[in-house]
Amino acid sequence: MVVVLAALMLWNEPNNLSHWNFALDPEWRGFAAMTCAAAARVRAVRPELPLVLGGISPIDVGFIRLLASYGVLAAVDRVAVHGFPLDWNHWPLADWPRKIAEIEQVANLPVWVSEAGASSFGADEIQLFGLRATARLLRGRVERLYWYSLLDLPPQWEATTRHRESEGSAYYRHYYMGLIRADGTPKPACAEFPRELGICQWFHFEDPRLEAAVDWLQRLGVQHVRTGLSWADWYRPGAEAWFDRQMQALRPFQVTLTLCYTPTALGVEPHYASPPRPEGQAEFARFAAWAAQRYAPVAPALGSLRALEPVR
């Protein structure tokens, strides 16, 4: 099955304990080896498919410099960053352009913002302000800008974070990042969402919200969608059927597909954020090549990286 893949993103937030337990890989050598191996396998089967380094959070110049020293940046076409200055980061919203410039200077690659957002935890008006200001600061500045997210997290679900204790009450901001409330009603920011921005929306295994999410994306006129497939889910019964269903539903959009989450059987420790053992690194590379072959055309509809135009 072929989907219009705009890019393949290798991992998510590799410098954040919620997604990569760097206490088990303190110099990120395991991450570098895994990413380079996956990039090589994807290049072998889909050489034209743009590869993006998983969005970093926090935005850390030193981390990008470290990965460059391992050859990771030579293996990808773009780097990505995440920022939530109104909710968790320790820098002001107005610093977005400076943050982008700092990473560009070190990476010598274009920078995507693969997650930017603001919660409605305190008030809907705060989220609306964050959307307006983020769009004003970054439209025309970056090739891709994905708003996180479309849907609020259902209150009965757990947020994907290992920082609950340190976050305190800020943990609950994770539940209010969407343009659409958990009950299906739109927030004020939804009515003003600029259709030229992308949206990042993650889906859980057999997520019942998939069809409603696609309906909202189409109503908003969104063209660019970032989502993910869980490597950990690849080994579950019915995984390929679910992956196919998810990707089939997203066919109307240009998709940046993120691959992330370690199967417990392949981790240094049995946790989705664990670095994989050496044999697991090869398995992730195999998963990445499988996803590229299954969901990307031989020559992507974007044609080449030259076709990637900044959002306006």
Where are these regions (language model features)?
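Short, acidic/polar
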Residues: 1, 60-70, 128-135, 204-219, ...
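Aromatic- and acid-rich polysaccharide-binding/catalytic face
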Residues: 3-6, 12, 54-55, 62-101, ...
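Residues that flank catalytic or metal-binding motifs in active/ligand-binding sites
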Residues: 4, 47, 75, 141, ...
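A structural signal for well-ordered alpha-helical scaffolds and beta->alpha junctions
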Residues: 8, 31, 35, 60, ...
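Acidic-and-aromatic substrate-binding clefts and catalytic sites of carbohydrate-active enzymes
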Residues: 15-18, 56-65, 84-96, 119-125, ...
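Aromatic-rich peripheral "rim/lid" segments of glycoside hydrolase catalytic domains that contact
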Residues: 26, 123-129, 133, 140-142, ...
